[in-house]
Amino acid sequence: MRIAILFLIFTTNILAEEIIGIPKIVDGDTVQINEYKIRLEGIDAPEMKQQCKKPYLQIMFFTFQKDYFCGQVSKKKLIQKIGNKPVKCILLGKDRYKRYLAKCFKGTINLNRWMVRNGYAIAYRKYSKLYVPDENLAKEEKLGLWRGTFVEPEQWRRKNK
């Protein structure tokens, strides 16, 4: 009997809960499905009011850049990628703001990875190194944020509290 109870306790903690539904996109790294506010684990997207720079004109060796709201672009790209389709989020825990941390999928596409690989978010190295190779590829190919210059979202939040 004790073994059965211990087995139930340990397996309950090991099994990850899945949430499936059509999400409301809050920003580039947060979605909401029903009452579940979900942070895409291991990534950090620019904040909604954050401005980044992107090239718009190159003359000889000079590249002129202009400001744009990169957090809004990040959110828009996630909306476009998901469309009006259901996603499956595998809940991995909670963050200090009580949001669920999750890996989310549209079909077989890992949305966390897709955001980083396409340059709309960065790997959140403070919490996970999982998406660093994807970030390196996006940087190498100058995709998304990597086309121009930007302050890492965590640094931007600290400066703009």
Predicted regions and their residues:
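Small beta-barrel nucleic-acid-binding modules, primarily SNase/OB-fold domains
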Residues: 2, 13-161
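Sec-dependent signal peptide hydrophobic core
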Residues: 4-9
